[in-house]
Amino acid sequence: MPGDYYDILGVDRNASKEDLKRAYRRLARKYHPDVNKEPGAEERFKEINRAYEVLSEPDTRSRYDQFGEAGVSGAGGFNYGDMGDMGGFADIFETIFSGFGGGMGTGGTRRRTGPVKGDDLRLDLKLDFREAVFGGEKEIRIPHLETCQVCKGDGAKPGTGAKTCSTCNGQGQVRRATRTPFGSFAQVSACPACNGQGQVIEEKCEVCNGAGRRQVTEKVKITIPAGVDDGTRLRVSRKGDAGLRGGPQGDLYVYLYVEPDKVFTRDKMNILSEITISYLQAILGCTVTVDTVDGEQELTIPAGTQPNTILTLENLGVPKLGNDAIRGDHLITVKVDIPTRINAEERELLEKLAHIKGQSHGKGGLEGFLGSLFHK
């Protein structure tokens, strides 16, 4: 005896038609044999189908509510062959399993004759650091499917056409009946002769071999906006695969990967780098030339600059993505080089400086004295 159909779908007896549809979609996706290979999944799937078949139609639902299974047993089990007259039910199946590709196997497959959008494509593109900062144009080569210009996409040799598939009589699907102790069930799959189209080409196009599309490699210029970062995704409209039966072309998605730079790193819109100056430059101050993404720039080192001080070059960072009039800053970390060896003349001068400062340098040497000049 089958279980209670409301319990099978997990709904109460006052469930609306939309509640039933949502429950069915969820359970059918979960237990479909093409998706769920666990033991018992196929039987569970059949129960779900039967429950929805009965409860989705007001007449059969009313009889079931009054008399239980006995009131609907004359239906003889779920019949996939009737799906052509059950538009709503078949539409649910098509919605649920449209993403599985190649049809449902043992479930119901509707013949699709309308336009189908082409597949989207992905391309990974490497940029150097400056290209990511300033953007620009890149020319890439992308292999994709385009509509065959000889047959205009229908796959037939010019001057010929298509005929009704004799295997499925134009239905696009073949059915096989299976008898079980619980009743008869019809299993449906896409027709292998016409791939579910219901028609077969009399003479295939010699250029695309009947596919209606052919593989080509196209040169595409893409614009890289200023300020992109590692992992940024760009969409290039209508540069994916051509659609089927007049469907629109897919899109190309370009994923950007920024290669590390030897000098610069990035923190959002700011560019980071380091310079090393001598202890005398740190004490006395100076002007040095530093590398930036805009070329060499002069940087003023204030007198008494401490190690690891961060100095800022404003508006020399990364442009804001989508508004390159706004830029971040270039932040420069100053490293101070304290020598480990000095010559005699330097030693004499430093000893005089140590005497003036009233600092002893016997313990730890002059290196210790130099280190004491900076606050660490």
Swiss-Prot record:
GO terms for cellular component: cytoplasm. It is found in: Cytoplasm. Zn(2+) 1 binds at C148, C151, C205, C208. It holds the Pfam family DnaJ_CXXCXGXG. Signal peptide: none annotated. PROSITE patterns: DNAJ_2 (PS50076), ZF_CR (PS51188). Residues 4-68 form the J domain. CXXCXGXG motif repeats lie at residues 148-155, 165-172, 191-198, 205-212. Zn(2+) 2 binds at C165, C168, C191, C194. GO terms for biological process: chaperone cofactor-dependent protein refolding; DNA replication; protein refolding; response to heat. A zinc finger (CR-type) spans 135-217. SUPFAM superfamilies: Chaperone J-domain, DnaJ/Hsp40 cysteine-rich domain, HSP40/DnaJ peptide-binding domain. Keywords: Chaperone, Cytoplasm, DNA replication, Metal-binding, Repeat, Stress response, Zinc, Zinc-finger. Binds 2 Zn(2+) ions per monomer. Its cofactor is Zn(2+). GO terms for molecular function: ATP binding; heat shock protein binding; unfolded protein binding; zinc ion binding. The J domain is necessary and sufficient to stimulate DnaK ATPase activity. Zinc center 1 plays an important role in the autonomous, DnaK-independent chaperone activity of DnaJ. Zinc center 2 is essential for interaction with DnaK and for DnaJ activity. Belongs to the DnaJ family. NCBIfam families: DnaJ_bact, PRK10767.1, PRK14293.1. Homodimer. Participates actively in the response to hyperosmotic and heat shock by preventing the aggregation of stress-denatured proteins and by disaggregating proteins, also in an autonomous, DnaK-independent fashion. Unfolded proteins bind initially to DnaJ; upon interaction with the DnaJ-bound protein, DnaK hydrolyzes its bound ATP, resulting in the formation of a stable complex. GrpE releases ADP from DnaK; ATP binding to DnaK triggers the release of the substrate protein, thus completing the reaction cycle. This is Chaperone protein DnaJ. It comes from Crocosphaera subtropica (strain ATCC 51142 / BH68). The lineage of its organism: Bacteria, Bacillati, Cyanobacteriota, Cyanophyceae, Oscillatoriophycideae. The gene is dnaJ.
